[in-house]
Design a protein with these regions (language model features):
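Conserved donor-nucleotide/metal-binding helix-loop-beta segment in metal-dependent transferases, i.e.
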Residues: 1-28
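Catalytic core and acceptor-binding pocket of nucleotide-sugar-dependent glycosyltransferases
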Residues: 27-134
């Protein structure tokens, strides 16, 4: 885990069948899961990554999860679906990622996301504006 250790097993149980999950900031065609601010990686995913000497200046989530997506699938890396990954962590608002409102009508709260860059803001109005920005 590359960020604060999860404090609740309820989150880990939701995601444990996937080797890597998180939302890539751009809408990619093959895979939209990357490192949007917080990511968990299985041992299998780390072993897959270790075959590469470096990322050649490409951000690691793009390098491993987009550019080498097909190779990862050959190594049986299991990426979480976008909808589940978004609930785990996101770097951008759902609207910005999908051009539509979230499926859930519930307002943003810290229980809905396990990790998110927006948590660095203390002002909840600022959070809401970032979460649902155009």
């Amino acid at each position: 885990i590359g960020a604060p250790w999860p404090s609740s097993r309820k989150w880990l149980n939701r995601f444990k069948k996937y080797d890597y999950y998180n939302v890539v900031k751009n809408n990619m065609q093959k895979n939209r899961i990357g490192n949007g601010g917080f990511s968990l990686r299985s041992r299998k995913f780390l072993e897959f990554c270790s075959q590469f000497e470096n990322c050649n200046g490409v951000p690691e989530d793009i390098f491993f999860c987009i550019l080498n997506y097909e190779e990862a699938k050959k190594h049986k890396i299991n990426f979480a679906p976008f909808e589940l990954a978004y609930k785990f962590s996101s770097e951008h608002s759902f609207r910005k990622l999908t051009n539509k409102h979230p499926v859930s009508k519930s307002k943003f709260n810290f229980q809905n996301h396990f990790g998110w860059h927006g948590k660095r803001f203390l002002n909840s109005d600022k959070l809401m504006n970032l979460k649902y920005e155009n």
